[in-house]
Design a protein with these regions (language model features):
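Amphipathic alpha-helical "output/dimerization" segments
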Residues: 144-161
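A short, aliphatic-rich beta-strand micro-motif
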Residues: 116-125
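Short hydrophobic/aromatic beta-strand element in the GNAT-like acyltransferase core
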Residues: 50, 120, 133
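Short beta-strand-to-loop transition segments that serve as allosteric relay/switch motifs
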Residues: 133-142
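Flexible loop/coil segments at beta-strand boundaries within sensory signal-transduction domains
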Residues: 124-129, 139
Length: 174
């Protein structure tokens, strides 16, 4: 994995974090209707062109819900800003990505894609592991208020609740 961030993207609890993600057994599945609908609602709520529900695996970031990046189901972990968002239990916000030192070599920021704004709230398990993000992306710089941050966190909680319910159903059916 190539790291384009000029900083580590592996949390100290990486091994346990990946085990927590594996428990839910949803990493290899393609995007699904529930999470894609959630991504669309998030995009409309925040008036952004792209919203994603992502899971951060060992090598890739998988998009379980995708609005605005049609046909893209995964991105190399070393390029996805979601890799930075799982390092913390609080949201990660880049109001103007081009001004962030850790993003100056990231191809999504400096390349043709032109990412300028990113806000990602971690999807956190009951045990405290950040397994993915609910994030929004824009091509223009943008301020993000405290109220908006709280709403994004609520969307991440909803995503985690759905993942937990699916995990319970899957494990009870075995």
């Amino acid at each position: 994995m190539v790291n384009t961030f000029n900083k580590t993207i592996l949390p100290e609890n990486e091994v346990d974090r990946l085990k927590a993600l594996e428990y839910f057994d949803i990493l290899n599945a393609l995007p699904d209707r529930y999470f894609s609908n959630l991504a669309r609602i998030i995009a409309v709520t925040f008036d952004v062109p792209i919203a994603l529900v992502s899971l951060v695996g060992s090598e890739d970031v998988i998009f379980k819900g995708n609005f605005g990046m049609k046909g893209i189901n995964r991105v190399d972990r070393g390029k996805s800003l979601c890799s930075l968002a799982v390092l913390d239990l609080e949201p990660t916000i880049f109001a103007d990505a081009i001004k962030e030192p850790c993003l100056l070599t990231n191809p999504l920021v400096i390349g043709e894609f032109g990412l300028r704004f990113y806000a990602g709230a971690p999807i956190i398990t009951k045990e405290g592991f950040s397994i993915g993000t609910v994030c929004i992306v824009g091509k223009e710089p943008r301020e993000f208020s405290a109220d908006e941050t709280e709403i994004l966190k609520l969307f991440a909680e909803n995503a985690m609740h759905e993942i937990e319910m699916r995990g319970i159903i899957k494990h009870n059916s075995k």
